[in-house]
Curated annotation (Swiss-Prot):
The lineage of its organism: Bacteria, Pseudomonadati, Pseudomonadota, Alphaproteobacteria, Hyphomicrobiales. GO terms for biological process: translation. This is Large ribosomal subunit protein bL33. One of its GO terms (cellular component) is cytosolic large ribosomal subunit. It comes from Parvibaculum lavamentivorans (strain DS-1 / DSM 13023 / NCIMB 13966). The gene is rpmG. GO terms for molecular function: structural constituent of ribosome. Belongs to the bacterial ribosomal protein bL33 family. Pfam families: Ribosomal_L33.
Length: 55
């Protein structure tokens, strides 16, 4: 059985609020860590979210 192409990752806020999103990414095409700007409702503004592993 083959290994799945997409894996689940956690996008954690850089504003140190503890807020995070869970999303999928294709590990074969996106080898580097994902950094994306999204809305943090605790900080009430758009901040960068960095990829971390789901524990």
């Amino acid at each position: 059985m083959a290994k799945p192409a997409s894996i689940k990752i956690k996008l954690e806020s850089t504003a140190d609020t503890g807020y995070f999103y869970v999303t999928k990414k294709n590990s074969r095409t996106m080898t580097e860590k994902m950094v994306i700007k999204k809305y943090d409702p605790i900080a009430r503004k758009h901040v960068e979210f960095k990829e971390t592993k789901i524990k």
